[in-house]
Swiss-Prot record:
Its EC number is 2.7.1.48. PANTHER family: URIDINE KINASE. It comes from the Bacteria. ATP binds at G12, G13, S14, G15, S16, G17, K18, T19. It holds the Pfam family PRK. Signal peptide: none annotated. Its main location: cytoplasm. Pathway: Pyrimidine metabolism; CTP biosynthesis via salvage pathway; CTP from cytidine: step 1/3; Pyrimidine metabolism; UMP biosynthesis via salvage pathway; UMP from uridine: step 1/1. It catalyses: uridine + ATP = UMP + ADP + H(+); cytidine + ATP = CMP + ADP + H(+). It comes from Streptococcus mutans serotype c (strain ATCC 700610 / UA159). This is Uridine kinase. Keywords: ATP-binding, Cytoplasm, Kinase, Nucleotide-binding, Transferase. GO terms for cellular component: cytoplasm. GO terms for biological process: CTP salvage; UMP salvage.
């Protein structure tokens, strides 16, 4: 019977560098069966709303996510069964009709701004990380990403940041730092922290697989 996969939770504010940290872990284990699952894929379907209504979505609130589905999918993967993960369309502000098949792996990195907010999700994790990065750096990264990758205007990004992103960070995201096993200041540039994390993952892999 297949051993239980290692589940690593990686969180932090938008633009903190959590995706880069996740990729650094992935890159360190090229021969392992390892995959990343993004909480963003589980934003709720909003096809029943008008586009104007969808644009006002608060993406930084726990209720924006269908976390129950993510939890169910992780339980299926733990049970060695594949799942179909939804794909979110940021240009239309709703879930795409497409999905992708995720096969069971030895390691899953579950990444997103609120992956430590739900205790049921935390309870499935073996290692929990919080990537802690200065607010100014995070907003600059968010502006670059949303303009280049999501077709957003500068004005809309700044308006959303001041109205939603910053207050939600302090209300919901930053408080989850207390649940982290490791807090990673400076993100992927913190080579000592990345090395410690990779050493721990390797140790668990050697013990259980």
């Amino acid at each position: 019977m297949r051993k239980k996969p290692i589940i690593i939770g990686v969180t932090g504010g938008s633009g903190s560098g959590k995706t880069s940290v996740s990729r650094a872990i992935l890159a360190n284990f090229p021969n392992a069966k390892i995959a990343m699952i993004e909480h963003d894929s589980y934003y709720k379907d909003q096809s029943h709303l008008t586009f104007e209504e969808r644009v006002t979505t608060n993406y930084d609130h726990p209720l924006a996510f269908e976390t129950d589905l993510l939890i169910n999918h992780l339980k299926e993967l733990i049970a060695d069964r594949p799942v179909d993960i939804p794909i979110y369309d940021y240009t239309q502000h709703t879930r795409s009709e497409k999905s992708y098949r995720q096969e069971p792996q030895d390691v899953f990195i579950v990444e997103g701004i609120l992956v430590l907010e739900d205790q049921r999700l935390r309870d499935l994790m073996d290692i929990k990380l919080f990537v802690d990065t200065d607010d100014d750096i995070r907003i600059i990264r968010r502006i670059k990403r949303d303009m280049q990758e999501r077709g957003r205007s500068l004005d809309s990004i700044i308006e959303q940041y001041t109205r939603v992103v910053k207050p939600m960070y302090h209300q919901f995201i930053e408080p989850t730092k207390r649940y982290a096993d490791i807090v990673v200041p400076e993100g992927v540039s913190n080579l000592v922290a990345i090395d410690l994390i990779n050493t721990k993952v390797a140790s668990i892999l050697n013990e259980t697989h």
